[in-house]
Amino acid sequence: MKYILFFAYTIFLLFVKFPVFSAPDRSKSTKLSEEQLLKKKEILLQVLKFGTTKERAMALRELEEFPSEHSGALIEQLGKILDRDPDWMMRVYAIRTVSELKLTQYEESILKLLKNEQPDIQRESIYATKKLKLEKATPILFEILKAQDFTKNSNLIVGLLDTLGGFPPQETISSFLLARLNENFNDPEIRAQIALFFGKNKDKKAESALLEIYKDSKEPITLRSFSVSSLGKMKSISSMQVIQEELEKIRNLKSKNEIKALQPLKIHSITALVSMGDKDILEELYAYARDDDPVVRLRAIKHLTDTGDMSVLEILEYKAQRDPSEKVKKAAKAAIEN
C-alpha cells in the first residue's frame, strides 16, 4: 500500500511541483537546475514504466524536449517500448518519438515493425522510414506495395509511394509503378500519386507516359495536373512545347464551366514551365498570389515554392509579412524556411 501511495505522490509531483508535462504549444521550456533535471528524469522513467497509456504518451512527448545529455535511460526505455510493449498504441507513440528525435540507432526495430500486422504500427513505421531516410527499407516497402490493390484508393499506398519517392530510383520499382500508372482501370487518385512519385524521385523513365497522360483530355484533371507537375520537377525540357500548346488551348476556352474545371491543370502547367526556366510566364503565377480569394493565394504559395525558382523569394517574403490571411502568411513563412 505504501508503494502505491508513493507512486501516486510521484505522479502528483509530476503535475504540480515539476513542470514535467508541458503544454503542446509552449515555445520555451522552463529552465531547470541539474538537480531538478535528474528528478524529472527519474519521474519520467517511472511513468514510462508504470503509468497509464495516456501518462506514458505524455511522457514520450516530454522526452522529445528533454536534454540529450540526460536522456540515456529514457531513450533505453523508449527502445523497450518500441520492441516489446504489449500496448500497440504505445508502440505507435514510440515510433513517433523515434522519428521526431531521429534516433537512427533503432533502424532495425523500425524495419521489423514495417511488417507488423497492426495497421497503425505499420503505417507509422512507414512514416518513420521516410523521416529517418532509411533507404535500407526499400525492399520491404516494395514488397508491401506489390501486395496492394491499386484499383482502390488507399492511405497505405499513398504513404508507401511518398516514402519510396524520397529514395533514389530503382529499375524494378519504376517498371512496376509505370505499369500501374498506365492501367486506366486503377483508382485515378492512386494513379495521380504514382505520377507524383516519378516527379519526386525525378525518374525520367516515366517522362513519355506522363506527357501522354497530360495531353489526354479523357484522363482525370487531377491526374493530368500531377503528371505535368512531375514533368516540371524532372526538368523535362523536351515537354515544354507540348505544355505551352495545352496551356494555350485552356486560355482559348469560352465556356465558364470548362475554364473553372481546368484551372488546376492551368496553374500546374504554368508552374511546370517556370520550373523549367520559362521566366516570361512567371507573372501569371504571381497573379494567383495576388488574387482576392485567400484560398487561391494559399494554393499559389505552394506552386511558387514548387517552381524552385529563387526569384519568387521576394513575393514570398511579402506574403509572409503582409498578406491579410494568417494561413497564407504561415504558408509563405514555411516556404521560406524550407
Give residue spans per PLM region:
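Conserved hydrophobic register position within alpha-solenoid helical repeats
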Residues: 59, 94, 125, 157-160, ...
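N-terminal leader/linker segments that initiate helical-solenoid repeat arrays
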Residues: 18-77, 89
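Short inter-helical turns and helix N-cap capping residues of alpha-solenoid HEAT/ARM repeat scaffolds
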Residues: 51-52, 86-87, 117-118, 149-153, ...
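Amphipathic alpha-helical scaffolding segments comprising HEAT/armadillo-like alpha-solenoid repeats
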Residues: 34-47, 68-82, 103-115, 134-148, ...
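A generic tandem-repeat structural signature
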Residues: 87-169
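Residue-level detector of extended alpha-helical repeat arrays and alpha-solenoid scaffolds
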Residues: 56, 91, 122, 153-157, ...
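Structural signature of alpha-helical solenoid repeat scaffolds
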Residues: 64, 99, 130, 162-165, ...
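Classical Sec-dependent N-terminal signal peptides that target proteins to the secretory pathway
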Residues: 1-23
